[in-house]
Amino acid sequence: MLSKRGLNPVQAESRKKKKREQIKVREERAKRHEERLSHRNMSQMERQLSELTQLESSQALNAHDKQLLQNLQRDMAIMKKKNIHGHRVGRVESDKTKEAERQHKPRKPFIPKNPKRSIYYDPIFNPYGVPPPGMPYREKEELSSETDESVIDIPLPSEEYPFEDPKPREKKNKSFKPKHHKKQDINASSAQPKSTTTTEAAANTKDIEEETMIEYSAQPVVRDLRQEAAQFLPAAFQRQKLAKGQKIGQPDRDVSSQVQEDKDEEIDNFYKEIGGYL
């Protein structure tokens, strides 16, 4: 062992640093291994472990199978210690798993005998009256015909109902009963139609209310579309019309007369030019 004088502090610090790095690398390697174990299939690992243990009890294992068995045992111990569950595609059928399935067997949904008595009954959305998940089954309370004592003690009013008509109207929808008239011997000459009296006609006219008719009328609106269309003319065209002394919105002169005037003006100019040469 070196004495204190021969100890190099720089070398001691480098050793500590190297040891810390080794511990860090070991931890990272363990984390990566645990992450790989979390993605492994638990059922497949259990199946391989059970097969290798059965094979080991019957015969000796070769080097590869021994190494595989050791790795599986080590991985299973790490998963149990770190509480890593992985995932399961299939499952190993055993007595324990079958017993657990029997104990935790899901119950069938309860269907009441009389669905209409259930408070959850609906003829369209819930015709069986089954309660929703997590809700207890309840039935409707039976309507009792007996009245409460507190309601019986209430005194009835002695007077008539204030909003009731004193003279109720007769019902219009009376049952029709045909009258059976006795046959009478009436001569054709003496038979005359019954004339309606003026009093009955006056009474009928009074009963009929004359409806007042209100008539609404309006005169047609006459619009000058030519004047309105003149607002959309270009400004240069409007100035040209104003220079000619024509109001904006009035129709132009006949096209044929305009063409004739242009021809006459060209002929006059031609004769003026010829007269200058003569």
From Swiss-Prot:
Domain of life: Eukaryota
Biased composition (Basic residues): 104-116, 169-183
Chain intervals with Basic and acidic residues compositional bias: 22-38, 90-103
Record carries keyword Nucleus: yes
Protein localization: Nucleus, Nucleolus
Region (Disordered): 1-43, 81-210, 240-264
Keywords: Nucleus
Chain intervals with Polar residues compositional bias: 186-202
Gene Ontology terms: biological process: mRNA cis splicing, via spliceosome
Pfam families xrefs: NpwBP (PF12622), Wbp11 (PF09429)
One GO term describing the cellular component: nucleolus
Predominant cellular place of this UniProt entry's protein: nucleus
Protein name: Protein saf1
Protein's organism: Schizosaccharomyces pombe (strain 972 / ATCC 24843) (Fission yeast)
